[in-house]
């Protein structure tokens, strides 16, 4: 699925509204339902799964936004931002095909609604990402009601069968030739209602509040990584399971290092004299300074590898390397005497017939040959 266009699967454009998406989904679902394709069941099942998954994501505004921005994996795992719904696709399936195929999905009576998954973006420095850190976050969400402990009831409450759906949790609406099942608007699919519900949560078993969580970020995480905290999302209705919380990692740009996988890269300026004569330099790493020996006649762009000075993988014990690329700085703010010394130095280089600038000589030799061949 990750390499397929969900809009193309449903046959709609990227600007399609929800009515167009729903209409396309219903048409394709009826066409490719396995029960309607007994002679081609394997292909129909595969198509039907794709259609279902495409509709699950594109019918949810937050998942759709996540898909448009980050792609299939982000939308499918619920890592878009702010908060989002995991959804229950079996409900959609039952709504569309409940009557057509003999009520494929049976209603479970008093149905509980799992809490939505939530997402939270944490911004880290490179040092925090590499060494790990403990972060405290605040999330405004639905939490279990402390008054009724999630039951939605108080001492005077009692449950009774929903008079609208007679306990089925669904009502049916006629649309043309089809009877479409939808969650009961009175009991919201639970099949029963609470008389004299909890005053604090109004019978839902949950209330809006701000939670404070301490999150342990493991060492070695990288930009775009996601951490799943099971059961730390939105509280479910009437004691139903809570959703999950997804922590999405964003690592700020570092003034010295650039990270690629488990390797680190940096650009290290050296003086003209050090490039010519060589010397020892102190190189910064995320674990302190180390000595790097620069050989004589080092050219700009030369890269030195410091093994094991990169990042330890969050998924294994392997450690990356640090790559230092040198750039030779041209002296500035020269005095008259210094300029004269450089001119004398240049004249000395031209004596004796030796080549001191092989790259320049090769470049200009190629230019001469180019014009000679015109």
From Swiss-Prot:
Zn(2+) 1 binds at residues 145, 148, 198, 201. CDD domains: DnaJ (cd06257), DnaJ_C (cd10747), DnaJ_zf (cd10719). One of its GO terms (biological process) is protein refolding. Zn(2+) 2 binds at residues 162, 165, 184, 187. It is found in: Cytoplasm. One of its GO terms (cellular component) is cytoplasm. Residues 5-71 form the J domain. InterPro entries: DnaJ, DnaJ_C, DnaJ_domain, DnaJ_domain_CS, HSP40/DnaJ_pept-bd, HSP_DnaJ_Cys-rich_dom, HSP_DnaJ_Cys-rich_dom_sf, J_dom_sf. A zinc finger (CR-type) spans 132-210. Participates actively in the response to hyperosmotic and heat shock by preventing the aggregation of stress-denatured proteins and by disaggregating proteins, also in an autonomous, DnaK-independent fashion. Unfolded proteins bind initially to DnaJ; upon interaction with the DnaJ-bound protein, DnaK hydrolyzes its bound ATP, resulting in the formation of a stable complex. GrpE releases ADP from DnaK; ATP binding to DnaK triggers the release of the substrate protein, thus completing the reaction cycle. PANTHER family: CHAPERONE PROTEIN DNAJ, DNAJ HOMOLOG 1, MITOCHONDRIAL-RELATED. The J domain is necessary and sufficient to stimulate DnaK ATPase activity. Zinc center 1 plays an important role in the autonomous, DnaK-independent chaperone activity of DnaJ. Zinc center 2 is essential for interaction with DnaK and for DnaJ activity. Homodimer. This is Chaperone protein DnaJ. It comes from Dichelobacter nodosus (strain VCS1703A). The gene is dnaJ.
């Amino acid at each position: 699925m990750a390499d397929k266009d969900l809009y193309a699967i449903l046959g709609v454009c990227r600007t399609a509204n929800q009515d167009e998406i729903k209409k396309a989904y219903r048409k394709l679902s009826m066409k490719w339902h396995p029960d309607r394709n007994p002679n081609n069941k394997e292909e129909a099942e595969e198509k039907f799964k794709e259609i279902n998954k495409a509709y699950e994501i594109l019918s949810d505004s937050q998942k759709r936004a996540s898909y448009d921005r980050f792609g299939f994996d982000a939308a499918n795992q619920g890592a878009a931002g702010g908060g989002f719904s995991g959804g229950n696709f079996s409900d959609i399936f039952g709504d569309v095909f409940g009557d057509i195929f003999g009520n494929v999905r049976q209603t479970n009576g008093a149905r509980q609604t799992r809490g939505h998954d939530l997402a939270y973006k944490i911004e880290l420095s490179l040092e925090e990402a590499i060494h790990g850190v403990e972060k405290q976050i605040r999330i405004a969400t639905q939490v279990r009601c402390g008054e009724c402990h999630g039951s939605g009831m108080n001492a005077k409450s009692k449950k009774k069968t929903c008079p609208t759906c007679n306990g089925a949790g669904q009502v049916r609406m006629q649309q043309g030739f089809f009877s479409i099942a939808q969650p009961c608007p009175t009991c919201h699919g639970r099949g029963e209602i609470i008389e004299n519900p909890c005053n604090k949560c109004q019978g839902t078993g949950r209330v809006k509040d701000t939670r404070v969580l301490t999150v342990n970020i493991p060492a070695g995480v990288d930009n775009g990584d996601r951490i799943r905290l099971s059961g730390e999302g939105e509280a479910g209705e009437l004691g139903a399971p809570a959703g999950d919380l997804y922590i999405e990692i964003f690592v700020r740009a570092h003034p010295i290092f650039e990270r690629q996988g488990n390797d680190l890269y940096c650009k290290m300026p050296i003086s003209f004299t050090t490039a010519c004569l060589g010397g020892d330099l102190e190189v910064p790493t995320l674990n302190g300074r180390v000595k790097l020996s620069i050989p004589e006649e080092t050219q700009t762009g030369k890269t030195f590898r410091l093994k094991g000075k990169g990042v330890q993988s969050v998924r294994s014990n392997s450690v990356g390397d640090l790559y230092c690329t040198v750039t030779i700085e041209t002296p500035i703010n020269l005095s008259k005497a210094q300029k004269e010394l450089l001119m004398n130095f240049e004249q000395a280089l031209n004596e004796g017939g030796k080549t001191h600038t092989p790259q320049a000589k090769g470049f200009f030799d190629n230019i001469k040959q180019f014009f000679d061949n015109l």
